[in-house]
């Protein structure tokens, strides 16, 4: 069995080297491949954990509504003996009295600040330095600047 290699030869004399052929002039294509890293739109939409777009848009709308008043100071409130804490916005209260009234209703107990009466729970707070102090020792405005979390302690501790 014979295998023949036949190639047609192309002579350079048949092509004029000074004039580019129409096929040569149209070959000047630039190939540019770009792989987009992450578009700004996509970066803004990356959530973890992933949530549905309708829920994301709803939450986004609520954030925009809250930005108008920008007055919220959420702190966590714990009560000794109660396994679940609560989150509370301190900016809705006018002072210590309204805070104590709300906490007494929320935890269904009587709470005091400042005085040490053995019949009532005592409200303490952690300041920005990590120290625990009695609520009511400083003015309300200063309290709002320093409070990090609240704890309702048992009466027997004091």
Curated annotation (Swiss-Prot):
Record's protein name: Auxin-responsive protein IAA31
Subcellular location: Nucleus
Subunit structure as annotated in this protein's UniProt entry: Homodimers and heterodimers.
Keywords: Auxin signaling pathway, Nucleus, Repressor, Transcription, Transcription regulation
One Gene Ontology MF term: DNA-binding transcription factor activity
Taxonomic source organism: Arabidopsis thaliana
InterPro entries named among the record's database cross-references: AUX/IAA_dom, AUX_IAA, PB1-like
Domain notes from UniProt: The N-terminal half of the protein contains two conserved domains I and II. Domain I includes a slightly degenerated ERF-associated amphiphilic repression (EAR) motif which seems to be involved in the activity of transcriptional repression. Domain II is required for the correct degradation of the protein through the SCF-mediated ubiquitin-proteasome pathway. Interactions between Aux/IAA proteins and auxin response factors (ARFs) occur through their C-terminal dimerization domains III and IV.
Residue ranges of domain PB1 in the record: 72-157
Function: Aux/IAA proteins are short-lived transcriptional factors that function as repressors of early auxin response genes at low auxin concentrations. Repression is thought to result from the interaction with auxin response factors (ARFs), proteins that bind to the auxin-responsive promoter element (AuxRE). Formation of heterodimers with ARF proteins may alter their ability to modulate early auxin response genes expression.
Pfam families: AUX_IAA
């Amino acid at each position: 069995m014979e295998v023949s290699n036949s190639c047609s030869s192309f002579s350079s004399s048949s092509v004029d080297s000074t004039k580019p052929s129409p096929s040569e002039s149209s070959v000047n294509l630039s190939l540019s491949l770009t792989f987009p890293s992450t578009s700004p739109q996509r970066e803004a939409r990356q959530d973890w954990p992933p949530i549905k777009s309708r829920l994301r848009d709803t939450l986004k709308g609520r954030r925009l509504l809250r930005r108008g008043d920008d007055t919220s100071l959420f702190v966590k409130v714990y009560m000794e003996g109660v396994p679940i804490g609560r989150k509370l916005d301190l900016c809705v209260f006018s002072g210590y009295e309204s805070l104590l009234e709300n906490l007494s209703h929320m935890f269904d107990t009587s709470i005091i600040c400042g005085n040490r009466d053995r019949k009532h729970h005592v409200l303490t707070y952690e300041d920005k330095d990590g120290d625990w102090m009695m609520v009511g020792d400083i003015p309300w405005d200063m309290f709002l600047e320093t409070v990090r979390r609240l704890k309702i302690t048992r009466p027997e501790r004091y």
